[in-house]
Amino acid sequence: MSPLHRQNFRFFHRLRVRWADVDMQKIVFNAHYLTYFDTAMGDYWRALALPYDSTLQALGGDLYVKKATIEYHASAQMDDQLEVALQCQRIGTSSMTFKGAIFRGEDCLISCELIYVFADPTTQTSKPVPPALRDILLAFEAGEPMATVEVGAWQALQSEASQVRAEVFVKEQRIPIALEQDAADATAVHAVARNRLGVAVATGRLVPHAPGVGRIGRMAVNRVLRGTQLGGEVLHALMAAAEQRGDHTVILHAQQTAQGFYARHGFTTQGASFEEAGIVHIEMVHPLVPSL
């Protein structure tokens, strides 16, 4: 394998070399590079908008490494910022071949080839790669979006939105279901993001707050897929809906842990923090330019 180039890849996983990764030669211990690629593979699935465990269960199989080949071109050192790149290069009947590279800036330090086999998790015998998974991998490498956002009424989106919200707010954050659900759902504008398997993975809603002011809330993203673009896509879909109906401003009550997310999307804080449903929140605001 010769060194690879950044422009060959769509997917990058970023990391910094830790002290624990470095050996007595003051370079990354060779075996850790496979761990870097394996960690990046988890992020690759996030980029596909597919929660790994539930997706593979639904597809009736799992992925097993058949072969891993690594070639070392140069060494990474303590505190280096690295980017681990992956690309699905070939899909056979039951196997998938990925090529990978680890970059420091423009320099390719490591290149690799990973071969996975799709197999029955009980018998560990190979099975054909499901057509739906094949299509998703090909679409991702072709640069296509991995999720779509539908904006609509509660009547159309209730089942999917409720499922995502229950997982996040009721099960994960232990908010009583009586507080999570309210009468505003019936008249709110809702948004649901679905992956390419048609599974709802993120949601949010928009309700009137005051004349010309909309309030976004019930923002929830599948736990495994946080840190991707799904939350931002739902947020901007709701902001667009607010603009279209003539709102000049949107506000929201951000959980303190999500304040940075909303700030990156142009929201600013106003007022003091407060507690809501037992969780610290802060009000945030974003001006809009209503559509004419």
Regions found by a protein language model. Name each.
Residues 2-67, 120-143:
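Hot-dog-fold acyl-thioester-processing enzymes
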Residues 2-7, 11-13, 72, 76-81, ...:
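HotDog/MaoC-like acyl-thioester-processing domains
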Residues 37, 145-179, 185, 190, ...:
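Short amphipathic alpha-helix that is part of the acyltransferase structural core
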Residues 86, 221, 227-240:
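Conserved acetyl-CoA-binding loop-helix of GNAT-fold acetyltransferases
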Residues 113, 192, 199-208, 212-220:
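Conserved beta-strand in the GNAT
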Residues 117-120, 219-226:
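A short, internal acetyl-CoA/4′-phosphopantetheine-binding micro-motif in the GNAT/acyltransferase core
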Residues 235, 242-255:
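Conserved GNAT acetyl-CoA-binding A-motif
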Residues 275-292:
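C-terminal "cap" of GNAT-fold acetyltransferases
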